[in-house]
Amino acid sequence: MTPLKIAIAGANGRMGRVLVEAVNNHPDTVLSGALEHSGSEALGLDAGYAVGLKTGIAISDDVDTVLAQSDVLIDFTRPEPTLKHLQKCVEKQVNIIIGTTGFDDAGKAAIRAAAEKTGIVFAANFSVGVNLTFHILDTVALVLNEGYDIEIIEGHHRHKVDAPSGTALRMGEVIAGALGRDLKQCAVYGREGHTGPRDPSTIGFATVRAGDIVGDHTALFATDGERVEITHKASSRMTFAAGAVRAAVWVNGKTGLYDMQDVLGLNNR
């Protein structure tokens, strides 16, 4: 079997470094390119320098050259560069795995449009455990659909720039969908001052940013006399990276827009 050629965007970032390691660890993949922004101090360095690997792949800012020698790009950067990379992937017929969060509606529309021409796995979280949690939440919300207040609490490291996290928002979307609600209409993001009694139709969000928290997410269903808490805690970014590489192998040869539920076969259950 010919190894799948995978390039990493943001290869010198916290997530990018772990992705380089994950590609190296997978028996069916090989690192074909590593991208960083122009002016990065890492340009020219071996892509594995930060994790003790010698990959033979130099970090570059030449997107066209990197994509020309790749089957898939994995991108966990920020919305603006991800959308630029997306258009290049369409031009080069390269599949793309998108773990970037914080897209606005226009950005999401661009991803949907691009999926008509290439294969895309776009997910708020690539952890197997988190995606199983989404699946569980759908069932729980259907059962606890009356008389329960719903809150989502998430925590991440001090460097995360968007809030709530994409994973927290996806949890909210799953719950709202199960309840027949529109998250845009029922979400409450933070509370301050005299807020009055809680509206029972709302889904609340609370955010923590501190230290080096990799990712903590809890969905709370509370009523008089009891509460149900469904929690996922990540202790290593490798869980996200390994999932992204798994998605890259899965989407090879496909066209269309998928998420991690598709990769894991959970959308068929």
UniProtKB/Swiss-Prot annotation:
Q: What GO terms are given for molecular function?
A: 4-hydroxy-tetrahydrodipicolinate reductase; NAD binding; NADP binding; oxidoreductase activity, acting on CH or CH2 groups, NAD or NADP as acceptor
Query: Know the name of this protein?
Result: 4-hydroxy-tetrahydrodipicolinate reductase
Q: Which residues bind (S)-2,3,4,5-tetrahydrodipicolinate?
A: 157, 166-167
Listed PROSITE patterns: DAPB (PS01298)
Quick one: which residues bind NAD(+)?
A: 10-15, 36, 99-101, 123-126
Name the pathway. Amino-acid biosynthesis; L-lysine biosynthesis via DAP pathway; (S)-tetrahydrodipicolinate from L-aspartate: step 4/4
Name the catalytic site residues: 156, 160
Q: According to the UniProt record, what class of enzyme is this?
A: oxidoreductase
Q: Where in the cell is it found?
A: Cytoplasm
Q: Which GO terms describe its biological process?
A: diaminopimelate biosynthetic process; lysine biosynthetic process via diaminopimelate
